[in-house]
């Protein structure tokens, strides 16, 4: 169900709204500051609630089936209600006012996490327990210690633009993590984004590799046709 960008609905969503069988809901850009009406959406698996004025996440506390949760560009400070949402796989929390991410402790299925632009965020120690984390953005935060990510064998993308993490610590992290990957037989290069330029060139490289692959396959097929 997609009712995003319909600001006229802001004042017409009753707390007892029937959402019992809804599995996917997009309520982005409505201007919501109250999401009490979601508390009974017990089958909800995907919630996109970007660009609102949400502060209180308590109504989400019992939505145990949630797997995808987009809450970026709100006014969230406390993510405590997410503590028991053990099935989360994707969590977008960028551009909020979050300082404490300990409620993410032990999220075993969480693989994508965006915390960028939470400028007061300093401590990411809890992420050492998020064992399947593979993509993380902590750009534009006050994070200075990246060592909690050292032993995350599945991590392959980390964005750290405009943080307090030193170049030497990034180098140590890269070496340590690659050793961990090697020990676990994982052949996936770690990509660390430190500037907008590095992100651009990284994307450029991927596109280049894709084009080479396409041209190579096309060329081989052409050769086969000519030599049948």
Where are these regions (language model features)?
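C-terminal membrane-anchoring or membrane-association module
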Residues: 216-228
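Core hydrophobic alpha-helical membrane-spanning segments
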Residues: 210-216
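Short amphipathic alpha-helix with an adjacent loop that forms part of the alpha/beta core around
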Residues: 14-16
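Concave beta-strand-loop units of leucine-rich repeat
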Residues: 1-9, 21-33, 43-55, 59, ...
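Juxtamembrane/start-of-transmembrane alpha-helix segments at the extracytoplasmic/lumenal side
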Residues: 195-210
């Amino acid at each position: 169900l997609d009712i995003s960008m319909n600001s006229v609905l802001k004042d017409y969503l009753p707390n007892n709204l029937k959402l019992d069988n809804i599995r996917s809901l997009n309520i982005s850009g409505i201007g919501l500051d109250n999401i009490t009406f979601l508390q009974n959406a017990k089958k909800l698996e995907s919630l996109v609630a970007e660009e609102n004025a949400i502060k209180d996440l308590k109504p989400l506390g019992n939505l145990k089936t949630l797997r995808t949760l987009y809450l970026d560009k709100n006014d969230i400070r406390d993510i405590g209600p997410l503590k028991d949402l053990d099935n989360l796989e994707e969590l977008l929390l960028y551009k909020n006012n979050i300082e404490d991410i300990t409620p993410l402790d032990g999220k075993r299925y969480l693989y994508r996490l965006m915390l960028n632009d939470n400028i007061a965020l300093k401590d990411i120690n809890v992420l050492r327990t998020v064992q399947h984390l593979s993509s993380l953005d902590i750009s534009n935060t006050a994070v200075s210690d990246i060592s909690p990510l050292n032993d995350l064998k599945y991590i392959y993308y980390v964005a750290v633009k405009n943080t307090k993490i030193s170049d030497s610590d990034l180098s140590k992290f890269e070496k340590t993590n690659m050793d961990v990957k090697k020990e676990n037989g994982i052949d996936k290069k770690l990509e660390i984004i430190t500037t907008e330029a590095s992100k651009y060139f990284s994307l450029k490289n991927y596109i280049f590799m894709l084009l080479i692959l396409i041209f190579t396959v096309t060329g081989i097929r052409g050769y086969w046709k000519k030599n049948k």
